[in-house]
Amino acid sequence: MALDTGASYTMIPWETAEALGLQPEISTKKANMITASGIEKVPVVTVDSIRTFGKLVNNVEVIVHDLPPKSHVDGLLGLSFLKHFKLTVDFRNGYLEIE
């Protein structure tokens, strides 16, 4: 997953959502997502938990959408996960800290 501090939601691909049994195709909650081709309404589902960077968050709302294969990214870690932590990005020294 790529870190995206400009994304309101964490994003997972359809294949992952379906493998987790989340049934995005019947989700009644939708979010607007800006893509290269315009604004799309995408399903919002709740993931039981996400663990990354040694941090765990339960009941995370995520959007379900596939990124282009050439992006080589399988999802985005957005604010629905990151808002639970203090995030420090130090570009000059090349490090990221989540606490």
Regions found by a protein language model. Give the residues of each.
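Pepsin/retropepsin-fold aspartyl endopeptidases
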Residues: 1-99
